[in-house]
């Protein structure tokens, strides 16, 4: 098939292969959203007189027929076809003749791929939000379950003060609430309509941009047509930062889990079927899941920088550099969802040791408790600090394992209910139901 930009001159196959690259492979992920965007666009075209009602009916039916094909994984971009936009138009043209070519009126592939990317991102962020919430629920459950089980707290990898599994699980739960804030900001950037910006400078057709915004359930539009094109790359980068924030939280948790599972710490134990073995050492039970999770999370954290390097030296307007952003951006959602799902599974099956601080080597961890006790009894804090320090040095310190932390967020007052309420408020604010209603109206037969 000739490219849709064909002007009647021979196509250099070497150039064609190089410029298309992996675009057909990547664009398969966008097929459903290309159909949704096209349905909104042709509905708007009919409203301004660029399509007849019978043409809209035929084109809509043809587009809607593609959706189950896409859902079944049977949609393909044929050899010689550049991208998903060209494939959809080709299929309509085969079915409807020249009428199929009318769907491109008032539109460029620039704003077409932009809306595809935004609809894709909006949808996949929803999956991430739901997965993060599921992981959060398990962390809160485990925090409540093990709230009274003490754990050494570390600074500089030196034993520091008493902590608890309640604090440890709860810390990562609250971390996810801040990550959710970034996911919401990313979602809001994706939930704006670039359709009508065409190649980046608008159209002489009297396009109704508000109509396509409403039909797609988008919150608003990218008003300035030049800026609409400038969101290409920027939107992906900022969304990638939100994904990276989630990945950073999980990566840190994975490191803790690997360390706590080692024999030198022995704070947690993984079920045998959640570990792997060695080909030479029969005693090994390796935490490979958490190690791979850590590596995958670090790879995800590199994506914003990779996108930045592709886009940070470009002036306004569209450039083909943007095509390569899809290769690192589109697959990131599935990888992060798999990471979150596996992390939730592992944490739900983890076993904790309940007598860790009974080991005398951790006695010094209670030194601050003793300093504070002496200070409460009237001894100046610095004098109490020196007294307890001297006792530790000469081996006369007697640890009192009874701790009394009552302030908000401490061992004795985790505030998990408040943390859970914050997460509930954040997730409830996503407008998923209104989006579902809009897309259902648009795509129903």
Each PLM stretch: what is its role?
Residues 1-37, 98-99, 266, 281-445:
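Glycine-rich cofactor/substrate-binding loops
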Residues 43, 47, 68-75, 93, ...:
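Charged/polar positions within long, soluble alpha-helices
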């Amino acid at each position: 098939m000739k490219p849709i930009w064909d002007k009647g001159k021979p196509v250099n196959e070497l150039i064609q292969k190089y410029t298309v690259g992996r675009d057909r492979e990547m664009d398969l992920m966008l097929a459903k959203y290309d159909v949704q965007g096209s349905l909104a666009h042709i509905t708007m075209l009919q409203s301004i007189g660029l399509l007849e009602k019978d043409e809209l009916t035929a084109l809509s039916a043809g587009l809607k027929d593609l959706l189950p094909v896409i859902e079944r994984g049977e949609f393909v971009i044929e050899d010689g076809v550049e991208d998903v936009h060209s494939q959809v138009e080709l299929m309509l043209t085969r079915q409807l003749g020249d009428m199929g070519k009318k769907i491109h009126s008032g539109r460029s592939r620039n704003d077409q791929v932009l809306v595809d990317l935004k609809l894709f991102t909006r949808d996949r962020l929803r999956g991430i939000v739901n997965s993060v919430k599921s992981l959060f629920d398990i962390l809160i459950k485990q925090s409540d379950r093990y709230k009274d089980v003490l754990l050494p707290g570390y600074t500089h990898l030196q034993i520091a003060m008493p902590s608890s599994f309640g604090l440890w699980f709860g810390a990562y739960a609250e971390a996810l609430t801040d990550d959710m804030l970034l996911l919401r900001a990313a979602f809001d950037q994706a939930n704006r309509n670039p359709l009508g910006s065409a190649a980046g400078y608008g159209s002489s057709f009297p396009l109704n941009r508000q109509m396509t915004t409403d039909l797609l359930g988008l919150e608003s539009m990218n008003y300035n047509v030049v800026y609409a094109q400038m969101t290409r790359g920027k939107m992906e980068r900022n969304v990638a930062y939100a994904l990276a924030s989630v990945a950073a939280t999980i990566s840190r948790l994975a490191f803790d889990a690997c360390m706590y599972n080692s024999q030198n710490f022995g704070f947690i134990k993984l079920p045998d079927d959640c570990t792997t073995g060695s080909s030479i050492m029969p005693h090994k039970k390796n935490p490979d899941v958490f190690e791979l999770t850590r590596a995958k999370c670090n790879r995800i954290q590199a994506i914003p920088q990779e996108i930045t390097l592709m886009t940070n030296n470009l002036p306004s307007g569209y450039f083909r550099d943007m095509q390569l952003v899809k290769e690192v951006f589109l697959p990131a959602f599935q990888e992060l969802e798999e990471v979150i799902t596996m992390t939730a599974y592992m944490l739900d099956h983890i076993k904790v040791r309940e007598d860790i601080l009974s080991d005398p080597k951790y006695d010094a961890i209670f030194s601050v408790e003793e300093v504070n006790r002496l200070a409460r009894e009237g001894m100046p804090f610095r004098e109490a600090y020196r007294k307890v320090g001297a006792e530790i040095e000469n081996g006369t310190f007697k640890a009192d394992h009874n701790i009394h932390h009552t302030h908000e967020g401490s061992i004795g007052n985790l505030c998990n209910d408040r943390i859970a309420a914050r997460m509930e408020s954040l997730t409830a604010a996503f407008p998923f139901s209104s989006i579902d209603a809009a897309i259902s109206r648009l795509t129903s037969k």
